[in-house]
Each structure stands twice: as C-alpha cells, then as structure tokens.
C-alpha cells in the first residue's frame, strides 16, 4: 500500500504543533516524535524569550508556556525566516490571541520590544550632519529612518515585574526609539507636541522647520505662537544632536 506523503506530513506536523488536540502518528515511535516535538517547540520558545525579554520576565513559567504554545499551535507564519518570527508573533497577538486573562498592555509591550529588535537589525546606516545647521528654522528637516516616533496607551518603557498596570493612564505615552551612530538602540520619552511635530515633518519633508512649528502653534491654539516656535527650536536642536532628525536631502 502506498503512503500518502502529504497526509502523513500533515498528521506529523499537527501533532508537533498541538499534541493536546491531535493524535500522534501511530507508526512513529513515541520517544522519537516527542524528541522532534521538543526540538521544534524549544526553538520557537527560545527565540521568543530572547526577543521579548520583558514579556518573558513578567509572566510565570505556566503563563509563558501557554502563550508560546498557543502561538506555536495556531499561528501560520507567512515568512520562513527566523528573524521575522517576532513580527509574526505580533500579528498573532493582534489578530488571533483572545485570552481575557492576558495583561491589557501585552500587545503594546510586545510591539515596543519588537521595535528595539527591528531597529537593531535595520539595514539603514545612522547618518549625522557634519555640523549643527545655521538658522535651523529655515531648514527642511526629515526624521531619520532609524528613529520611530511611537504612541502607546500604556507606559511600556516602565513595565517590569514591580510595575504591571491594570488600567491605562489618563494620558498616553509618547516615545522615540532610535539607533544612534554607535548602533545602540535608545529611547526618549517625548511630549504630545513633540510627537505631533515629528508627525508633521514625516508627512511633508518639503516643509521648513519654521513652517512646521507654525502649524503646530496653530493647532495648539496657543496664545503666543512665538513661545511655541522658540521652545520647538530647542527641541529640534536636541533631536538633531541625537541624529533623530537631519537636514532633508
């Protein structure tokens, strides 16, 4: 009798992924398939643990195993590359994971940790202008591709075993995660107005710093736009020193 290889392969893979809900192939030794199962799962488990260290730290062993196993059993990765498993894990958390017992910030924390990994392996090089530009207000500026402005409901950069918020604060958290000239990934907490200013620069790289700050002042409804422009200039100078922004090409 011929063996349907694809059917046998599917049967084998189903058990490897989810042994609690799929029977082991009857013609494979239990010791052998258990070894394969542990090998596959441990590879995924170790990769997730190394890329989401804070998430791993705040979950006990049972919680972590259940989360990793749920991902391993149910998610169908679209990429064959190990380096893209963290992004696949994010897609799983956003679209497939449905566990009322999860921390409410779980997805945001995972995204924040993924950003650090993604920036660390990004192919772009950090580039700094040779000097602080004169009359920065008249310059066109752009946000570095290695600087990502982010907004979260939870203060994800503070989450730790000793700080596990159960409700989102009244105000969101705004961050820039960026890679510097030494290829170190850093973060900077910013104000909502700084976040909006960077958004303006990203939306239109032909706008000058002054025009961007004027737009910000108009949107804020501030009684003294000159104050916004002066404060904004100081912020831009700081961001430029950190290579978060640079002169537009």
Cite the ranges covered by each PLM segment.
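Short acidic, hydrophobic short linear motifs in intrinsically disordered regions
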Residues: 206-217
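Residue-level marker of regulatory loop/turn positions in helix-turn-helix DNA-binding domains and
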Residues: 33, 189-190, 224
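Short beta-strand "wing" residues that participate in macromolecule-binding interfaces
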Residues: 246-247
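Short, positively charged loop/turn segments that connect secondary-structure elements
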Residues: 218-232
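Hydrophobic packing positions characteristic
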Residues: 73-196
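Short helix-to-turn junction characteristic of helix-turn-helix DNA-binding domains
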Residues: 200-205
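N-terminal, charged low-complexity regulatory/assembly segments
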Residues: 1-122
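Basic amphipathic alpha-helical segments that dock to polyanions
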Residues: 231-243
């Amino acid at each position: 009798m011929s063996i349907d290889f694809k059917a046998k392969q599917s049967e084998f893979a189903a058990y490897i992924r989810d042994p609690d809900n799929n029977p082991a192939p009857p013609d494979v030794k239990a010791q052998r398939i258990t070894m394969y199962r542990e090998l596959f799962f441990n590879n995924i488990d170790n990769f997730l643990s190394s890329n989401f260290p804070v998430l791993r730290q705040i979950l006990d062993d049972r919680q972590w195993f259940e989360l990793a196993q749920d991902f391993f059993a149910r998610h169908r990765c679209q990429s064959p590359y190990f380096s893209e498993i963290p992004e696949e894990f994010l897609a799983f958390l956003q679209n497939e994971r449905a566990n009322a017992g999860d921390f409410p910030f779980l997805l945001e924390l995972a995204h924040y940790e993924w950003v650090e990994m993604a920036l660390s392996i990004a192919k772009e090089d950090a580039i700094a202008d040779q000097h602080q530009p004169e009359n920065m207000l008249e310059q066109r500026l752009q946000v570095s591709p290695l600087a990502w402005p982010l907004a979260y409901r939870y203060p994800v950069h503070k989450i730790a075993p000793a700080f596990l918020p159960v409700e989102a604060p009244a105000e969101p958290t705004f961050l820039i995660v960026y890679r510097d000239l030494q290829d170190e990934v850093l973060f900077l907490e910013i104000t909502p107005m700084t976040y909006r200013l960077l958004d303006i620069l990203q939306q239109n790289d032909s706008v000058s710093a002054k025009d961007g700050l004027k737009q910000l002042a108009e949107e804020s409804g501030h009684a003294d736009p000159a104050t916004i422009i002066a404060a904004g200039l100081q912020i831009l100078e700081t961001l430029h020193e950190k290579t978060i922004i640079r002169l537009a090409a």
